[in-house]
A protein has these predicted regions:
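Conserved GNAT-family N-acetyltransferase fold
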Residues: 48, 58-60, 77, 82, ...
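Conserved acetyl-CoA-binding loop-helix of GNAT-fold acetyltransferases
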Residues: 81-104, 247-259
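Beta-sheet entry/capping signal
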Residues: 46-47, 59, 76, 106-109, ...
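Active-site/acyl-donor-binding loops of N-acyltransferases
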Residues: 64, 108-161, 223-247, 255-328
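Amide-forming acyltransferase catalytic core, primarily the GNAT-like/NAT-type
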Residues: 6, 12-52, 66-67, 122-238
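Conserved acetyl-CoA binding element of GNAT-fold acetyltransferases
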Residues: 73-86, 232-244
Length: 328
């Protein structure tokens, strides 16, 4: 067995391995293509376990993503989909894969590890620096019935303008109107970059049908799409950027988000939050935290990870930064 970086010659094997390991992902090819389309070198970020015949037996997927800390940009990666073949799980291949990944990608973060994986990650140097909570709210009880058996709502059915609480948001239809965010939005937080190349790849590459709304006279924005689970259509706040030093900025985004759901006659709303201020705004609008908090792990220096995790004022993470929303 060899643990190495993937190449373009491994693509068909990656398809086959992911189809076998994640049978519930009917669009597994599209998901892999989405990640490796980010850059010409993207497939080389992936670490695989391969036998002597080149058949893939394990993987850890990575996506290059830069982040800001204290206003300084750091090149890093996002890690996800760590899995090895059943026949290797009794041995040391899983740990060896994780150790190889640490050496190849020293500035990486991830979320959602189970208890066993998290314990191993902590032993090899990861810090538990936060948790991503999923909040669920109701836009209007009257729209719950109209959300059943409705299917996805295409973004071309979304309104062009949202007016709410002293703010106006315009839906962005053309790439030249995408916000030009070239630096950290919130200096007090570790925050992933939202440069033009990220926004273009993440929301305009066609994997899912997103709508991006930008606030007038500002680069504040939020991104939404609909998902269908158990025949119920929900509206998801996938991404957002605003100055979190002023709670009213996030309040305007949540208010506009709820207004959009009402215009679309959708009852269920979903928001991801890793920051106490966002938690507070969501709860003020009667959102409830549901499910298991997804631990955020990082190969970074952090003097008191217990404190920053408890205060939830260290890292800004949205559903767009994680791999989970991509598979919804």
């Amino acid at each position: 067995m060899k643990i190495r970086r993937a190449t373009s010659e491994d693509l068909q094997q990656l398809y086959a391995f992911n189809h076998r390991m994640y049978p519930e992902r009917l669009n597994y090819k599209e998901i892999i293509d989405f990640w490796i389309a980010k850059s010409p070198e993207a497939i080389n970020d992936i670490i695989v376990v391969a036998d002597d015949d080149g058949k893939i037996k394990g993987q850890q997927l990575f996506s290059s993503m830069s982040y800001y800390r204290d206003g300084v940009e750091v090149d890093g990666t996002w890690a996800f989909d760590l899995i090895v073949d059943e026949e290797l799980r009794a041995g040391s291949q899983g740990f060896s894969l994780m150790w190889k990944c640490k050496k190849e990608h020293p500035h990486t973060m991830s979320s959602g590890s189970n208890d066993i994986s998290m314990a191993i990650n902590m032993k090899i140097g990861n810090k538990h620096i936060g948790d991503l909570k999923k909040f669920v709210g109701i836009a209007n009880p009257l729209w719950l019935l109209t959300s059943v058996f409705r299917g996805s709502v295409p973004s071309n059915k979304f309104p062009q303008v949202l007016k709410t609480k002293g703010a106006i948001y315009q839906k962005i239809e053309h790439l030249e109107n995408i916000p030009q965010i070239k630096e950290s939005y919130n200096l007090q937080l570790l925050e992933y970059s939202r440069k033009l190349d990220f926004i273009t790849w993440r929301f305009f590459s066609g994997l899912h049908d997103y709508a991006l709304y930008k606030r007038d006279l500002s680069d504040d924005y939020f991104v939404v799409r609909t998902i269908v689970r158990n025949h119920v259509t929900s509206l998801v706040l996938v991404d957002y950027r605003c100055r979190l030093s002023d709670e009213s900025n996030m309040d305007k985004i949540i208010c506009a988000f709820k207004s959009l759901a009402s215009k679309l006659k959708l009852g269920v709303l979903i928001v991801g939050s890793s920051v106490a201020l966002v938690d507070s705004v969501c709860m003020r609008y009667h959102f409830k935290a549901v499910g298991r908090d997804r631990p955020i792990l990082g190969m970074i220096s952090c003097e008191d990870s217990d404190r920053v995790r408890e205060t939830r004022n260290f890292i800004l993470l949205t559903l767009a930064d994680t791999d989970g929303e991509v598979t919804w």
